């Protein structure tokens, strides 16, 4: 359905390099596991040629290498097989949403939590791409589930499973490290505060018992997690392999002066409330109501304090970490929080016992399905009714919230029907992608020296990302004619990522 999206051209080729070289040196600023998994089908069956001594690999020039590698091979086939891997991870995540909600609140709640989860547009949209955020979300949730089980039953098999998926979460994205402090916190709650005998520690022997129990619960999980992570990194001799990657996260390809866009304004460094607002306007309103409803019933749920902590503290910490450390480039960073919230939202079904509440729930559910389905196939660009729907999304956010350069296939259909149309395409997929999809790089006028934007003539298909960024360029260069969003009304759109203008 979609052409190669922005980050796919680095995640997938990097995965091929890792599988070929059996080491994680190329693009070590990103955890490798999702890229490796996505590349595995192509590596085994397509077998594209790859020279591990390629100059771009040696110099860690992952953007240029990824672009050249994909578009000189069968990019569509390689990306399709990689996307199928991520889709499977998304389905697996949905299974555990149902499983956990069922064990906590009953089978009906499990089914309702599953229903809530599978219609979240941001999750669905990124599950169609090679997304490290979806991979992290799946492993984060499953590891948390098994760690919760291990605290409930203290069985070795649950500790091992929690550790396995913890290692995978760490290997999927560096923000997987959040599992460590969360698991320590939950273990502390389980050991010290879960029974009356743990509230009044009078003797050092009792303290010692609790410490032994504490470490007995967490150390096996952490040990297995490290072994899995070490395996993902192909058993490096230097055990600082992961911390080296963590340190390099902000060292590569990050421009601190890049102006972040929100609500029509630009600001270097972004806003602390970027992700909170993004969550509110890019999540269907019925989902938000389900969640508030569940929170209003917080004291009525027949589950333990520890159960509630797993479902509420985990997404809260993810929100906080994302808000104060992640670049303001997309609500996709919040995807790992959604399954926990869907599970908790599912709990409301166990409190539905009046006709009025049944009618209200059904009405919300119909609205929810309509809102989500109506955005197909552009779930990635979904915005809710608070801002007037997806058509107005560009007024509030850009980048991976709307346009990631993923609509070249639909652009090809448009240019076939309108052969004289000019294209303005700014993503790093660039000329090779335009040629690969049969559009032709010569149609892209972005680099023409003449001021084509000042006196436009004919038909233009313009990337919405460019249109948003042109607003700040028009201010910086005192060039009002660049600001097409203010000057002209588009005749049509291709999804939400290309605006069609006729002059």
Positions of predicted regions on the chain:
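Hydrophobic, aromatic-rich transmembrane alpha-helices
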Residues: 97, 278, 283-305, 362
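C-terminal luminal/periplasmic domains and tails of membrane-associated envelope-modifying transferases
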Residues: 387-503
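Signature aromatic-anchored transmembrane alpha helix within multi-pass, membrane-resident enzymes
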Residues: 181, 218-222, 299, 304, ...
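Short helix- or helix-capping micro-motifs
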Residues: 113-118, 145, 166, 170
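Interfacial juxtamembrane loops and adjacent helix segments
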Residues: 24-85, 239-268
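Membrane-interface transmembrane helices that cradle and orient dolichyl/undecaprenyl
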Residues: 143-158
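Membrane-interface helix-loop-helix junctions at transmembrane boundaries of multi-pass membrane enzymes
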Residues: 103, 196-216, 293-313, 355-358
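Transmembrane-helix motifs of polytopic, lipid-linked glycan transferases
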Residues: 84-104, 139-146, 299-300
